[in-house]
A protein has these predicted regions:
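Surface-exposed peri-terminal alpha-helical interaction modules
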Residues: 2-176
Length: 176
């Protein structure tokens, strides 16, 4: 879940972190993740409005309750991922400063709110929903990993030395 609240920075949103955010937003990894995320959102919407709706009508009451619960988790999980990806795209397109994207309100929730809850073993979910659940969980885990690496889980020892960082910039600007 994208956490809302008072604007606070996750960690130091200085030039180094902003550079990491901008580099990711411009990367092929972002392109692939964004494409996969948006395609999964569209596929899920089509499934839930079409075949999923029909399949849910064939379920017994207990299974239908499990279906409703898991489909809500699925849509919540995907909306969280889509929101995160849209923030990264806004950085890429210049609509948001990389430092602003470091704000804690744009992070994925640390709680397992979007995590799948085990359903009673008697509940058999339709294959289409089960497939979407597995794929959305994998995507969420990957985006959570990216979020933590880019914004939260950075040890001070991992940050580049300020002098070395400046030397690298000078070398890049003026060549070796």
């Amino acid at each position: 879940m994208i956490e809302m609240g008072a604007p606070t920075m996750a960690l130091d949103a200085g030039p180094w972190r902003a550079g990491v955010v901008l580099d990711f937003a411009r990367s092929e990894l972002f392109d692939r993740t964004f494409r996969e995320g948006m395609e999964l959102v569209e596929e899920t919407a089509a499934y839930l409005d079409g075949p999923g709706r029909q399949e849910s009508k064939l379920l017994n009451r207990h299974a239908a309750l499990g279906y409703a619960s898991e489909s809500m988790r699925l849509t919540t999980r995907l909306m969280q991922v889509a929101s995160w990806l849209l923030v990264q795209r806004a950085v890429r397109e210049g609509d948001m400063e990389p430092q602003a994207a470091c704000d804690a309100r744009y992070r994925l929730a640390r709680e397992a709110l979007a995590a799948r809850t085990e359903i009673d073993s008697r509940t058999v979910l339709p294959i289409g929903l089960s497939d979407l659940l597995v794929r959305s969980e994998r995507l969420y885990e990957r985006v959570m990993h990216l979020d933590r690496r880019m914004y939260v889980d950075v040890d001070e020892t991992e940050q580049p030395h300020p002098v070395l960082s400046q030397m690298e910039k000078l070398q890049a600007a003026f060549g070796r």
